[in-house]
């Protein structure tokens, strides 16, 4: 494709497929009374030159909500625009967010991902190189779901240890006393040479978090993650002061890098978290990573719960210096859909970034069509 044609290309068409996964990954306590189908919305942007940008979006509580936001609020901002105007589009979406759109945390990130995918493909480069490569591989840690019994956590950790993975993150089921038993017995089961992390998903009081954190220090855990809701900054600051154990936070912090900046300013985390789904795409995640780097902090990239978008996470992780791990959500078969193939993890627990242009992996369009609940399309009327 001629350089001038690339420079002048524009977004001609936006398509979405709301796709059923037929899974509910949370227990009744966390699911609550509303529906919790773990659905996915597949998004495709097509340029006038035929280059396609692909992303997936959460549709967990209601695919109607995700679909409507994209088609009613985001599409008018993007249609007819150059995909190279990502930064301008990104800020325009923040403008309409404030003026009574109020996007959910998982939007508008996927649109940004699709724009980056187009531009990397146009350049003929894998996404991580288009961003500016730092590395090609990362060690993974297996990150499990909630389990009702202690033995299930132990079995899961031992299984992934046997697969060559060097670290496991437990999402303990609660209450606090049960979590502490799980922490101890996990360490006993996997031995001292295997790394462990804990993420109770905002279940603790400050006193409980300090008590658990001191236990994790004795057991040589890597970090304690999200013991409180991410907006409880006073509690996080107190916890960071009380413990030597690193505290990881900001997974759900609103306001992208502006929100994370307040956390860093109040010394309310030792490690910040971001991902391309919940932190406004690649553009937002890179801003957070560079912000954290300025303060000597790691930005550990968080799973999107969708393998395709986690490959995008991998590209970002390979384009920044201050990320040590790739979060590998398990069991993988629950998160693969609708991506073709498995995550490229070797027998030593190392994941390698794809080398094809753009994101570099494919979706299974037959599976998407066969499980599609709703399909929508908008085209630029001036095309």
Indicate residue ranges for each PLM-predicted region:
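Structured beta-strand/loop patches that form or line metal/cofactor-binding pockets in enzymes
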Residues: 2-54, 58-59, 331-337
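Conserved, mostly hydrophobic/aromatic
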Residues: 11, 50, 74, 111, ...
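Metal- or metallocofactor-binding catalytic centers and their adjacent structured scaffolds
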Residues: 14, 46-122
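A cross-domain feature marking catalytic cores of carbohydrate-active enzymes
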Residues: 57, 142-144, 170-172, 198-202, ...
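Glycine-rich, aromatic-flanked loop segments that form ligand/cofactor-binding clefts
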Residues: 103, 112-147
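Metal-dependent enolase-superfamily TIM-barrel catalytic cores that perform enediolate-based chemistry
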Residues: 133-243
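Shared catalytic-loop signature of beta/alpha-barrel
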Residues: 214, 220, 231-350
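C-terminal extensions of enzymes
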Residues: 332-383
């Amino acid at each position: 494709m001629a350089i001038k044609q690339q420079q002048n290309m524009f977004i001609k068409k936006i398509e979405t497929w709301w796709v059923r996964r037929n899974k509910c990954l949370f227990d009744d306590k966390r699911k609550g009374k509303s529906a919790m189908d773990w659905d996915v919305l597949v998004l495709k942007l097509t340029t006038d030159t035929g280059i396609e940008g692909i992303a997936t979006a959460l549709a967990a509580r209601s695919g109607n909500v995700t679909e409507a936001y994209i088609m009613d609020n985001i599409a008018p901002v993007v249609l007819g625009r150059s995909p190279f105007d990502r930064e301008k589009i990104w800020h325009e979406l923040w403008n309409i967010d404030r003026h009574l759109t109020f996007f959910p945390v998982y939007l508008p990130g996927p649109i940004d991902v699709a724009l980056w995918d187009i531009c990397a493909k146009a350049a003929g480069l894998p996404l991580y190189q288009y961003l500016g490569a730092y590395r090609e591989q990362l060690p993974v840690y297996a990150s499990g779901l909630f389990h009702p019994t202690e033995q299930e956590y132990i079995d899961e950790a031992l299984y992934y240890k046997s697969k060559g993975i060097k670290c496991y993150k437990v999402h303990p089921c609660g209450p606090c006393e049960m979590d502490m038993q799980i922490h101890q017995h996990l360490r006993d089961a996997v031995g001292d040479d295997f790394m462990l992390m804990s993420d109770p998903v905002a279940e603790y009081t400050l006193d409980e978090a300090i008590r658990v954190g001191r236990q994790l220090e004795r057991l040589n855990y890597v970090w304690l993650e999200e013991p409180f809701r991410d907006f409880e900054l006073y509690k996080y600051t107190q916890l960071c002061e009380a413990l030597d154990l690193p505290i990881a936070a900001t997974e759900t912090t609103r306001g992208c890098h502006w929100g994370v900046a307040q956390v860093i300013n109040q010394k309310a985390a030792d490690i910040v978290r971001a991902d391309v789904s919940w932190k406004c795409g690649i553009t937002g995640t890179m801003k957070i990573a560079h912000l954290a780097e300025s303060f000597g902090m790691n930005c550990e990239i968080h799973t999107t719960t969708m393998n395709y978008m986690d490959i995008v996470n991998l590209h970002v992780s390979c384009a920044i210096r201050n990320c040590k791990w790739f979060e590998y959500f398990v069991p993988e078969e629950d998160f693969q859909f609708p991506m073709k193939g498995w995550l490229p993890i070797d027998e030593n627990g190392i994941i390698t970034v794809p080398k094809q242009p753009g994101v570099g992996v494919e979706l299974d369009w037959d599976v998407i069509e066969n499980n599609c609940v709703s399909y929508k399309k908008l085209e630029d009327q001036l095309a």
